[in-house]
């Protein structure tokens, strides 16, 4: 998207990494520094809105039951919509690099999404696996999958590899931001 004046930042992180906390703090920092319009977009929400407006689903849970080919079309359409938002502003896309499924890791950013979004930077919010496991166990407000510290470590390593593959397609940079316990403000400043 050569005529784009804005920027697309993709922000990812495992459940329990503190991605949302860091994102909220970063948005406040950008606002206080006088950046132009910054739009936060949840990729899954845009996909759901696309499917609902097409009459394919009534609620978000129905998304998983759509045929794979239709889901891919919705993914592409959502990515193009987000890319258009970034023509003249900063868009931060909140999504997951990989989703752990019973069949293995599912890419959150397949090639056709990366090509449409053409992100300027891909940001991975990480923490020590022990910190993530601890945060998940303390968070009673969310239904989180139970993963061992070793599985969390593998998941983060796989996300790094996936981020580099996405960066290769789009010519993006990749930044890893460590969000240690009690240090969200420092992570957001990065």
What are these regions (language model features)?
Residues 95-139:
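ATP-dependent NMP and nucleoside kinases share a basic, alpha-helical "lid"
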Residues 14:
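P-loop (Walker A) phosphate-binding loop of NTP-binding proteins
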Residues 39-107:
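ATP-dependent small-molecule kinase phosphotransfer cores
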Residues 11:
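Hydrophobic anchor at the beta1->P-loop junction of P-loop NTPases
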Residues 28-39:
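Post-Walker A helix-loop "phosphate-sensing" segment adjacent to the P-loop in P-loop NTPases
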Residues 22:
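Hydrophobic positions on the alpha1 helix immediately C-terminal to the Walker A/P-loop
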